[in-house]
Amino acid sequence: MMSCFAGTRGSARVWLCAIALCLLASSCARGAAAFPNKPDSPGEDAPAEDLARYLSAVRHYINLITRQRYGKRTLTEPYVPEFIFQENRGDRSSNPRFDSVTMW
């Protein structure tokens, strides 16, 4: 079983890197199908039943794409850290400034 690794340790590393690369490529390929496919248009001269089926599929597709996501993304206002606007506030006692040369 280990006859393919009978050479040096470098060949084992090459095999492990190749396997890791294959696993990474397969995991990326599965991530591409995260969104559903767009429904196919039935054409201009399609019967009413096909058009109704198509419109239902489009409505379902739009509902899936635009659904609300719950969790950290439900904030109504964007998160801005307070230290960015710290100088714009009137309270400067918590952030003293040394403008005099006496400290040197």
From Swiss-Prot:
Pfam families annotated for this entry? Hormone_3 (PF00159)
Name the CDD domains for this protein.
PAH
Q: Where are its TM segments located?
A: none
Q: Name one GO biological process term.
A: feeding behavior
GO MF annotations in UniProt? neuropeptide hormone activity; neuropeptide Y receptor binding
Question: Which residues does UniProt assign to the signal peptide?
Answer: 1-34
Tissue occurrence = Lateral brainstem, dorsal spinal cord and retina.
Q: Where would you find this protein in the cell? A: Secreted
Provide the alphabetized UniProt keywords.
Amidation, Cleavage on pair of basic residues, Neuropeptide, Secreted, Signal
Q: Name one GO cellular component term.
A: extracellular space
- Primary location recorded for the protein, binned into one broad class: secreted
Q: What InterPro entries does this protein map onto?
A: Pancreatic_hormone-like, Pancreatic_hormone-like_CS
Where are the Tyrosine amide residues found in this chain?
Y70
Residues forming the propeptide are 74-104
Q: Which family does it belong to?
A: Belongs to the NPY family.
Q: What does this protein do?
A: NPY is implicated in the control of feeding and in secretion of gonadotrophin-release hormone.
Q: Can you name this protein?
A: Neuropeptide Y
Instruction: Name the source organism.
Output: Lampetra fluviatilis
Coding gene?
Answer: npy
